[in-house]
Regions:
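Short, low-complexity N-terminal intrinsically disordered segments enriched in polar/charged residues
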Residues: 17-53, 57, 157-200, 204
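Positively charged n-region of N-terminal signal peptides that target proteins for export
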Residues: 1-4
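A short gly/proline-enriched turn/hairpin at secondary-structure junctions
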Residues: 64-75, 90-93, 211-221, 234
Length: 296
């Protein structure tokens, strides 16, 4: 009987230790919303101090910024530092500005990759709005915090340009990187379904809980059904887009970015912008986890 008690006690002790270990792992797992709020607070603090060096430390060494201005991606931490130095220079329209950022959605998509999306507003010292828009970013978790892998932030204001003053969308890059062809197919299908005004097939390019953060829609759209139901196509509009950069992140995740243009065939007006998206590879398909595209 004594042996039985000893065995029971040992078993209970092992179960208790196992449960404690599981609890500790859960407790130590990073919370996406908390990490995102902390990241945005650090970003805002550095911006409001006009501290380019501090801001650049929020990015990984190989991070990419896709923003409304300039009209090309900013690649790598050193280039990102220079971009912030330019933003805070006294020649910049954003000199001595301050920024307000809010988080709409934050998610963990793997053990070390996170996404976030929300809105931003940049104001002058008199609180006049200089620029406002939406953001949808991808982050890498390291040393207890997240850093930008991809910033894709775009202003709401629309700038239309005559056709002769717009750069023609060139062909997409070629790459032998893993799963690149699946991304290329996804982008081609996106263009086709928009131009065919096919909301059903367009929505199926997204994961079931996919996020759409685009300048043509009010707010940030969550979920495939909402993406489909919110599509409004205008007659005479023709979309084109390309891929200018791609990176496979492991764990069936990839980021890609590029340029887009939309032509009004009735007036000749062309609207241009950039996009930076997060994809999930499943079999032969690349599904959009998050689309983040906006105006130049």
């Amino acid at each position: 009987m004594k042996k039985l008690y000893v065995l029971l006690f040992s078993s209970l002790l092992l179960i208790s230790c196992s449960n404690n270990n599981k609890k500790n792992k859960l407790d130590s797992s990073p919370d996406a919303k908390t990490l995102m709020d902390e990241s945005m607070q650090r970003f805002a603090n550095a911006w409001n101090q006009g501290n380019a060096a501090m801001l650049s430390e929020e990015f990984t060494i190989d991070a990419v910024r896709i923003i409304s201005n300039p009209m090309s991606p900013i690649i790598g931490k050193n280039a990102i530092l220079k971009s912030f130095e330019s933003t805070f220079s006294d020649e910049s329209e954003l000199y001595k500005s301050h920024i307000e950022i809010s988080v709409v959605e934050a998610r963990s998509v793997s053990t070390d990759i996170f996404l976030g999306t929300g809105i931003f507003k940049i104001l002058d010292k008199n609180n006049n709005v200089l620029e406002d828009g939406k953001w949808g970013n991808v982050f890498k978790y390291t040393d207890g915090k997240i850093k930008f892998l991809l910033e894709s932030a775009h202003r709401n204001s629309q700038i239309q340009t005559e056709a002769e003053n717009v750069s023609i969308i060139t062909n997409s890059i070629d790459s032998e990187a893993l799963h690149f062809e699946k991304i290329k197919t996804s982008v081609s299908n996106y263009i086709k379904y928009v131009n065919d005004q096919n909301a059903e097939d367009l929505s199926l390019l997204f994961s079931e809980n996919g996020i759409q953060n685009v300048s043509s829609k009010e707010g940030i759209i969550l979920g495939r059904d909402n993406i489909r139901n919110s599509e409004i196509f205008l007659e005479g509009q023709s979309l084109n887009a390309n891929i200018t950069g791609y990176k496979y992140l492991e764990n069936s995740l990839a980021i890609a970015y590029g340029k887009w243009s939309q032509t009004d065939e009735n007036t000749g007006e062309i609207t241009t912008g950039q996009w930076g998206n997060l994809f999930k590879i499943e079999g032969e398909n690349a599904f959009l986890i998050m689309e983040s595209a906006g105006l130049n």
